[in-house]
């Protein structure tokens, strides 16, 4: 429990200390923000700072810091270190610069930002990559909640249309269309802060429940510094890929421009972007602690946690909430596993619309132009979702690549931020170091992960245990990271001029 409290204190202190260092490095000033300068009444709308924070928190969080943290807890309390230091030195830095670089470039999407600082090829790669990723995220967060609602009705003894996934999927997709189409302050600006508060209350309730109930004890890092994973899965780099939301996640860079278009002052950036990521880190720390504390540890392995997660991640959330908060926990759990994914799904589709609008220079003030992009974006999501509900389409194979692509996206954004800081003649090491680290993570996982090259190289024992060839993968990961750092240092020696700043037709 002591190590948990130390990590919690470090996270909070990190916001005030290192967050200030990051802010001073960027150098916010009193220039006119896109929300004030453009103010189209749709995507560029000035919102109060507290709403910006709550919306950003819910955009980047959803159930990510809960699911990911509990999966990460399979490795034991060592995951506390990744959540804490990953958030302070990588995730919050990533979120801050993805938001503030966007703000400095008229609220540009992350694909356009990547193009400005990493070149035209990377821009086009990121455009396609971002749209595909966002539509996939939006679709998954439509199908998942629809299935959970069906389960609730079936468990309550209901029959008929309300027990069909297709019925609820259509309702969720209709809501997504409305939220993607209308002004950001009409739905997202009004209900997101409420759900953001619920997400925080749920984490506080779980934390209090662990502390006040004597049967639960959070294990110490120094007592379980090695891996406690029941399947013997290596800490490096699997834990760093599994725990994305709650440490560092490339998906956040697609969401930060939404709030960059709604800020009244650049000086709100630290609270909105860095602060929201630290808050997500705290939430992840609480849920990781719950995963370590509530379930049986056998022979130094988290076997009890593995068993509850085998019943489904939603079941695990429900179980934790009930054990720590009783009947109140049931209501919060249902709200969490249904509302939180939906609030991530609608902004994923909204971000996809904005990426396309920046790509094809389509002004979004006119409703016809928004409709022009909303229809195909939601149409693809509907085809995937309905096809999956009817058993015609199985996109889970593609979705398995999300974990790796998510962290690779974070790596790319950090390298873009490093180039930005170089051009601004500022300390680029605060982004280049985590960029190098994430390059090693992504490269190592690409060699080890069963979704990637691991499916051709890893082998299983007679007992079905996967054996990972870490002796080859680890040096490869380090070599790739050193190579990328070398390319970056070589590039900044050759470049002496500022990149072309695009206005994106705004």
Q: What annotation goes with each model-predicted range?
A:
Residues 138-156, 164-168, 180, 199-226, ...:
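Hydrophobic alpha-helical segments and their helix-loop junctions in multi-pass secondary transporters
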Residues 10-11, 15, 56, 90-106, ...:
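Helix-loop-helix module between adjacent transmembrane segments
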Residues 99, 209-221, 275-319, 386-393:
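Extracellular/periplasmic helix-exit of transmembrane alpha-helices
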Residues 48-64, 207-215, 224-287, 332-344:
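Hydrophobic, membrane-embedded alpha-helices of multi-pass small-molecule transporters
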Residues 1-19, 72-102, 111, 122, ...:
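Extracellular loop-to-transmembrane helix junctions
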Residues 123-127, 162-170, 275-284, 292, ...:
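Loop-to-transmembrane helix boundary motifs in multi-pass membrane proteins
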Residues 10-66, 268:
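Membrane-interface "cap" regions at the ends of multi-pass membrane proteins
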Residues 5, 9-27, 129, 145-149, ...:
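Membrane-interface loop-to-helix entry segments
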């Amino acid at each position: 429990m002591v190590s948990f409290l130390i990590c919690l204190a470090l996270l909070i202190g990190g916001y005030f200390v290192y967050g200030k260092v990051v802010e001073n490095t960027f150098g916010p000033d009193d220039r006119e923000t896109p929300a004030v300068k453009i103010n189209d009444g749709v995507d560029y709308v000035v919102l109060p700072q507290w709403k910006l924070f709550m919306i950003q928190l819910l955009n980047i969080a959803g159930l990510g810091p809960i699911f990911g943290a509990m999966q990460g807890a399979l490795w034991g309390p060592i995951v506390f270190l990744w959540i804490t230091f990953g958030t302070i030195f990588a995730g919050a830095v990533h979120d801050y610069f993805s938001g503030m670089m966007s703000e400095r470039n008229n609220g540009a999407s992350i694909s356009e930002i990547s193009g400005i600082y990493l070149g035209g090829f990377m821009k086009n790669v990121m455009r396609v990559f971002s749209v595909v990723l966002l539509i996939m995220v939006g679709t998954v967060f439509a199908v998942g909640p629809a299935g959970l609602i069906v389960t609730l009705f079936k468990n309550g003894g209901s029959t008929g249309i309300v027990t069909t996934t297709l019925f609820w999927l259509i309702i969720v997709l209709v809501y997504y269309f409305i939220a993607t189409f209308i002004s950001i302050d009409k739905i997202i600006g009004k209900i997101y802060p409420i759900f953001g508060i619920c997400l925080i209350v749920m984490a506080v309730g779980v934390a209090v429940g662990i502390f006040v109930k004597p049967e639960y004890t959070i294990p110490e890092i120094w007592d379980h510094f090695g891996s406690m994973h029941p399947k013997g899965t290596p800490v490096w780099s699997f834990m760093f890929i599994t725990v994305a939301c709650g440490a560092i996640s490339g998906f956040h860079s697609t969401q930060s421009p939404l709030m960059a278009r709604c800020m009244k002052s650049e000086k709100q950036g630290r609270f909105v972007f860095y602060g929201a990521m630290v808050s997500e880190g705290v939430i992840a720390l609480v849920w990781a602690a719950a995963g370590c504390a509530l379930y049986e540890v056998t022979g130094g392995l988290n076997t009890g946690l593995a068993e509850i997660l085998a019943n489904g991640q939603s079941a695990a959330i429900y179980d934790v909430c009930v054990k720590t908060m009783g009947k109140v926990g049931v209501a919060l759990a249902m709200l969490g596993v249904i509302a939180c994914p939906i609030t991530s799904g609608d902004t994923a589709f909204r971000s996809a619309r904005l990426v396309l609008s920046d790509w094809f220079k389509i002004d979004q003030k006119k409703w016809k132009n928004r409709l022009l992009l909303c229809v195909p974006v939601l149409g693809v999501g509907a085809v995937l979702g309905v096809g999956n509900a009817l058993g015609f389409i199985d996109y889970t194979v593609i979705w398995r690549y999300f974990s790796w692509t998510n962290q690779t996206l974070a790596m790319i954004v950090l390298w873009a931020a490093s180039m930005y800081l170089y051009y601004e003649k500022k300390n680029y090491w605060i982004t280049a170091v985590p960029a190098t680290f994430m390059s090693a993570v992504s490269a190592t996982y690409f060699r080890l992960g069963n979704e990637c090259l691991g499916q051709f190289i890893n082998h299983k024992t007679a007992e079905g245990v996967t054996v990972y060839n870490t002796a080859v993968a680890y040096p490869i990961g380090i070599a790739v990271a050193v190579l990328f750092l070398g390319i970056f240092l070589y590039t900044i020696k050759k470049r002496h001029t500022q990149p072309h700043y695009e206005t994106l037709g705004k």
